From Swiss-Prot:
Native source organism of the sequence: Homo sapiens
Described purpose of this protein according to its UniProt entry: Precursors of the cornified envelope of the stratum corneum.
Oligomer status and interactors: Interacts with CYSRT1.
Lineage, broadest ranks: Eukaryota, Metazoa, Chordata, Craniata, Vertebrata
Tissue occurrence: Skin-specific. Expression was readily detected in adult trunk skin, adult arm skin, fetal skin, penal skin, vulva, esophagus and tongue. Not expressed in the cervix, rectum, lung, colon, or placenta.
GO cellular component, one term: cytosol
Name the UniProt record assigns to this protein: Late cornified envelope protein 3D
Amino acid sequence: MSCQQNQQQCQPPPKCPSPKCPPKSPVQCLPPASSGCAPSSGGCGPSSEGGCFLNHHRRHHRCRRQRPNSCDRGSGQQGGGSGCGHGSGGCC
């Protein structure tokens, strides 16, 4: 009797199925961003900055390394003349 009880206790717990636990992906950014930012910028514009903070933060660092002047001034955040527009590279 005790042997059967031990076998029941030693069974591994059921694993979480993949559909219930999907990893975070940029796809979650696209639906809210389609209304406020161009999809070519990765779907992480200023309108969706709250729901897409990680991707926006990562893109911002990458853009600052490439074009520090235009991004730090913020000249391209509204109009986008020097490479930081809504659809240029994720610095909007």
